[in-house]
């Protein structure tokens, strides 16, 4: 089975959300119908080139994301003082800016997830199959490991002495504080993803899909401003895993579970909130 262009909609699944756009959608909004949910398993995807192309796009995007952001974090730590570097604001801009750019580049190929927590949230909302979700997460983690690995390969000594961008709970904060920061931070991100890519909003306003990367990147920026002092900001299990594996010091693994459990809980809460409260999908008429 050959890959088709309709595979590359948001979520990159076999169930595109085709709706009228612009002002023509205003009068037909009452006729809007929810797109069918993606199946739990879609074996046919495994024979489609677009499936593997999407996975490669996720790998490359996460690779570039880790490469740029880890270098930025190292640059800040290497400076003699905060005034001599871009500081926390610069780190936040690097993370948010890279997400903005990479989502823009890959949205038409894979949906531009670049984050297992985002993929998990979209899977819970039935925007993509389990087959695709697992494949994306594997490719994202591999991309993150390679991205951090290239940084270490280019600068081995600074990488080890400057922490390698690994996430840990900062001194003075409890594990509960770190977990809470990761849950709420990921909730903000995934809720923004749902809102920015909502099919019904896209039907009413033609500019929504084009602008989607902007609020997503801005959400990442704001979450980093708030939580860098607490956990270094994970909200992306692949980002945390890649840095931890390549840095590979004991303290980088002590709290590593927080950077998986927190983002997955936050993503699940965002998916439930958007689907049940905002969209009220379970309460809509079946007729």
UniProtKB/Swiss-Prot annotation:
Localization per record: Cell membrane
Disulfides per UniProt: none
In-chain residues carrying the UniProt-annotated modification N-acetylmethionine: 1
Coiled-coil annotated spans: none
GO cellular component: cytosol; plasma membrane
MF (Gene Ontology): water channel activity
Superkingdom classification of source: Eukaryota
Annotated transmembrane regions: 56-76, 93-113, 134-154, 176-196, 210-230, 258-278
CDD domains: MIP
Gene3D superfamilies noted in UniProt: Glycerol uptake facilitator protein
Short sequence motif named NPA 1, residue ranges: 115-117
Chain positions with Phosphoserine modification: 285
Keyword annotations: Acetylation, Cell membrane, Membrane, Phosphoprotein, Repeat, Transmembrane, Transmembrane helix, Transport
Segments on the Cytoplasmic face: 1-55, 114-133, 197-209, 279-287
Membrane topology: Multi-pass membrane protein
Region (Disordered), start-end ranges: 1-36
One GO-annotated biological process of the protein: response to water deprivation
Keyword Metal-binding appears in the UniProt entry: no
Annotated tissue distribution: Predominantly expressed in roots and green siliques. Also expressed above ground and in flower buds.
Family: Belongs to the MIP/aquaporin (TC 1.A.8) family. PIP (TC 1.A.8.11) subfamily.
Domain comment quoted from the record: Aquaporins contain two tandem repeats each containing three membrane-spanning domains and a pore-forming loop with the signature motif Asn-Pro-Ala (NPA).
The protein's role, per its UniProt record: Aquaporins facilitate the transport of water and small neutral solutes across cell membranes.
PANTHER family, sorted: AQUAPORIN OR AQUAGLYCEROPORIN RELATED
Official protein name in the record: Probable aquaporin PIP1-4
Organism: Arabidopsis thaliana
């Amino acid at each position: 089975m050959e890959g088709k262009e309709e595979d590359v909609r948001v979520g990159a699944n076999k169930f595109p959300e085709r709706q009228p756009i612009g002002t023509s959608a205003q009068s037909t909004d009452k006729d809007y119908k929810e797109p069918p949910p993606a199946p739990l398993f879609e074996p046919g995807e495994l024979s489609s080139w677009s499936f593997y192309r999407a996975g490669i796009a996720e790998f490359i995007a996460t690779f570039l994301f880790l490469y740029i952001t880890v270098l930025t974090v190292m640059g800040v730590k290497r400076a003699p003082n905060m005034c001599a570097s871009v500081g926390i604001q610069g780190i936040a801009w690097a993370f948010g800016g890279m997400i903005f750019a990479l989502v823009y580049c890959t949205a038409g190929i894979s949906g531009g997830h670049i984050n297992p927590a985002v993929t998990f949230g979209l899977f819970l909302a039935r925007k993509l199959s389990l087959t695709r979700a697992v494949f994306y997460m594997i490719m994202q983690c591999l991309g993150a490991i390679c991205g951090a690995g290239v940084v270490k390969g280019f600068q081995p000594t600074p990488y080890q002495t400057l922490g390698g961008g690994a996430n840990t709970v900062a001194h003075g904060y409890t594990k509960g504080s770190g977990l809470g920061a990761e849950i709420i931070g990921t909730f903000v991100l995934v809720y923004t993803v749902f809102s920015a890519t909502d099919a019904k909003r896209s039907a009413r306003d033609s500019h929504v899909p084009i602008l989607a990367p902007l609020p997503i990147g801005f959400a990442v920026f704001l979450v980093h401003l708030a939580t860098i002092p607490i956990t270094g900001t994970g909200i992306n299990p692949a980002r945390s895993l890649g840095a931890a594996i390549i840095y590979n010091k004991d303290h980088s693994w002590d709290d590593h579970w927080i950077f998986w459990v927190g983002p997955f809980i936050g993503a699940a809460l965002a998916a439930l909130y958007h689907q049940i409260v905002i969209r009220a999908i379970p309460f809509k008429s079946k007729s």
